[in-house]
């Protein structure tokens, strides 16, 4: 009779706990086992036994023996990791934005005695603590930081729960925020902000592309000008080298011609040949005067070709006259002069004809 009364009292307390919390605790999901003297406790469970209404001991997994009527199983605690869905709730951020947020809580009972006698419903208590802690932590952050510092927010909630739930024999392993719902207007403003940020990035990237393009074009023009100047420089160097080679070749040819002419002048009748050449060039120069419309200076009697030739020969003779050695034959000189005069007269007759 006492056992039945005790079981009835335990069932009444359990129903009262369920009604107060509004949910069925995980630890009493399968009900309380009866005292059958010999009991087998499953793995990862802890059965709290009371003797005559006072805590007696905690049954370990395996075979256990109880005294009928005196001993009663009062609580059954699961030592497995428990997952609890934290209901959606409203919270206000630091910048006065109201959010709807929910989460998932992972916890484990570390001390069955504290979990049984420290709080009426440990799971419900931890859920309420998680909600209040989450509201408190969200009030410390602005809306932007809520999305950026999600991991740190979860860690702060876990630390706050563990500090408060230590006396309940419960340890919070982790807390994860599932969904964050913002008001429609705030969502629209956030979307506009995101679009503005994207447009800003696009503008920056476009300007950077334009700058890089301008730099590349300028660099290309610079390289083209450098190459063009180098090519022009090389062309001028080659042209100068060619002109220098041509001048040198002309100088060498002229020097060779002068050398040959000097050698020819030293031969027999060389002076006469030179005089003849000078006379030809003199007459040829005056013959071109009639063809060109130029203002020139003419001798006093341009029609007298013989006098012009004689004058040219006199100039050449004055330039080429050299002192004669004392032993030179004067008769030979006179003969040479006469021969030269004869040649000039013949040349005059040829020109006049």
From Swiss-Prot:
The modification N6-acetyllysine is found at residues 145, 233. The modification Phosphotyrosine is found at residue 124. InterPro entries: Band7/mec-2_domain (IPR050710), Band_7 (IPR001107), Band_7/SPFH_dom_sf (IPR036013), STML2-like_C (IPR032435), Stomatin_HflK_fam (IPR001972). Disruption phenotype: Embryonic lethal at the preimplantation stage. T-cell-specific conditional knockout does not alter the normal development of those cells but decreases their responses to stimulation through the T-cell receptor. Its main location: membrane. Residues 324-353 are annotated as: Disordered. The modification N6-succinyllysine is found at residue 145. Residues 1-28 form a transit peptide. It is a peripheral membrane protein; Lipid-anchor. Residues 215-252 form a coiled coil. GO terms for cellular component: actin cytoskeleton; immunological synapse; membrane raft; mitochondrial inner membrane; mitochondrial intermembrane space; mitochondrion; plasma membrane. The modification Phosphoserine is found at residues 17, 330. The keyword Nucleotidyltransferase does not apply. It comes from the Eukaryota. One of its GO terms (biological process) is mitochondrial protein processing. It is found in: Cell membrane; Mitochondrion; Mitochondrion inner membrane; Mitochondrion intermembrane space. SMART domains: PHB. Keywords: Acetylation, Cell membrane, Coiled coil, Cytoplasm, Cytoskeleton, Lipid-binding, Lipoprotein, Membrane, Mitochondrion, Mitochondrion inner membrane, Phosphoprotein, Transit peptide. Forms homooligomers. Interacts with MFN2; may form heterooligomers. Interacts with PHB1 and PHB2; recruits them to cardiolipin-enriched mitochondrial membranes and stabilizes them. Interacts with CACNA2D2. Mitochondrial protein that probably regulates the biogenesis and the activity of mitochondria. Stimulates cardiolipin biosynthesis, binds cardiolipin-enriched membranes where it recruits and stabilizes some proteins including prohibitin and may therefore act in the organization of functional microdomains in mitochondrial membranes. Through regulation of the mitochondrial function may play a role into several biological processes including cell migration, cell proliferation, T-cell activation, calcium homeostasis and cellular response to stress. Belongs to the band 7/mec-2 family. This is Stomatin-like protein 2, mitochondrial. It comes from Mus musculus. The lineage of its organism: Eukaryota, Metazoa, Chordata, Craniata, Vertebrata.
């Amino acid at each position: 009779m006492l056992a039945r009364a005790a079981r009835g009292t335990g069932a009444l307390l359990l129903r009262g706990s369920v009604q107060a919390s509004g949910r069925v605790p995980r630890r009493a999901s399968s009900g309380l086992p009866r005292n059958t003297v010999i009991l087998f406790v499953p793995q990862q469970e802890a059965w709290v036994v009371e003797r005559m209404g006072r805590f007696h001991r905690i049954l370990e997994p395996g075979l256990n023996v109880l005294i009928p009527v005196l001993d009663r199983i009062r609580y059954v605690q699961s030592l497995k990791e428990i997952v609890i869905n934290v209901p959606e709730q409203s919270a206000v951020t630091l910048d006065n934005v109201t959010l709807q947020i929910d989460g998932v809580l992972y916890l484990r009972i570390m001390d069955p005695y504290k979990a049984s006698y420290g709080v009426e419903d440990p799971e419900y208590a931890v859920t309420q603590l998680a909600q209040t802690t989450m509201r408190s932590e969200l009030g410390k952050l602005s809306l932007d930081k809520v999305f950026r510092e999600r991991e740190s927010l979860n860690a702060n909630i876990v630390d706050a729960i563990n500090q408060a739930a230590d006396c309940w024999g419960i340890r919070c392993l982790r807390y994860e925020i599932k969904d964050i719902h913002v008001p429609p207007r705030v969502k629209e403003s956030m979307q506009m902000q995101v679009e503005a940020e994207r447009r800003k990035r696009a503008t920056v990237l476009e300007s950077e592309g334009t700058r890089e393009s301008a730099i590349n074009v300028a660099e290309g023009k610079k390289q083209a000008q450098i190459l063009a100047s180098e090519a022009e420089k090389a062309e001028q160097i080659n042209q100068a080298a060619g002109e220098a080679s041509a001048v040198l070749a002309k100088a060498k040819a002229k020097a060779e011609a002068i050398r040959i002419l000097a050698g020819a002048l030293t031969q027999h009748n060389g002076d006469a040949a030179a005089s003849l050449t000078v006379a030809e060039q003199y007459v040829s120069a005056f013959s071109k005067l009639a063809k060109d419309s130029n203002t020139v200076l003419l001798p006093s009697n341009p029609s007298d070709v013989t006098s012009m030739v004689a004058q040219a020969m006199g100039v050449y003779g004055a330039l080429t006259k050299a002192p004669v050695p004392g032993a030179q034959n004067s008769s030979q000189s006179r003969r040479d002069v006469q021969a030269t005069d004869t040649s000039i007269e013949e040349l005059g007759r040829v020109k006049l004809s």
